[in-house]
Amino acid sequence: MKLSNDEQYYSKEANRSYWSVSQYKDFCKCEAAATAKIRGEYEQPTTKAMLIGTLVDRWFEGTLEQLRQESPNIFYCRNGALRADFRKADEIIKRVQRDERFMRFMSGEKQKILMWEMFGVPWKAKLDSFCDGICITDLKVVQNFKSLAFWRYELQGAVYQAGVEACGYGRLPFYLAAATKEAVTNFDIFQIDQPTLDLALAEIMANMPRFIAIKAGLEEPHYCGVCDYCKSVKKARIRNYSELLEV
């Protein structure tokens, strides 16, 4: 299956056929929820927290105006005023576009789609900014810089770097172009060093045999018991009240 546009890339068929960083992370969080998403039985709702990042992404892609035309409700309240989410996204955009270094790292080929084989299965990736022979940069809009490590972006960097190398572009360094949603936007370029990327790829390799077997229907997925999907399909059980008192 070829993936030449967003419709194909994000299709249910593509998610069944390919692995991606987001799908791998889904399996790490909850195998049952990840399996349900692949089967089309569960769809994780988009949150307001994700919207600001999406708007900034679309500006760098050059498709923000298209989104405004297609979904005006994202931008405007019923009274015609700009929504707070878009106002914040607009602040971030105006701030980072005045910074030469930030814009240079985001000046590569936008949303480049890669397809390759790794660990015996097909993978897909879409790069925010690809500078051939120079670097891979991923745009991140986060609450603050401390939250960057929480989201484990080294996993994303490891997969993207491996994909770029497998597609014949060589091994390139991986950077995060990060901006915050704080009252006064903070922004910087973070390089994830090679030893960290190597460890992340080794971790993925160790987990993939089980995840591949689950996706293929050869093993049963584990239910984490705490995510929204697990709560949506659970059955009541008798529990000890003292569980709630544990620190």
Predicted regions and their residues:
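Generic recognition of cysteine residues
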Residues: 28-30, 77, 131, 135, ...
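Alpha-helix initiation/capping motif
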Residues: 30, 47, 131, 145-147, ...
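Short secondary-structure junctions and interdomain/linker hinges
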Residues: 62-66, 100-103, 153, 211-221
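Broad hydrophobic/π-residue packing in well-ordered secondary structure
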Residues: 34, 57, 139, 153, ...
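Mg2+/Mn2+-dependent nuclease catalytic core
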Residues: 105-203
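Metal-dependent nuclease catalytic regions and adjoining charged, substrate-binding loops involved
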Residues: 3-5, 86, 149, 162-247
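Metal-dependent nuclease catalytic cores that hydrolyze phosphodiester bonds in DNA/RNA
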Residues: 1-126, 237-238, 242-244
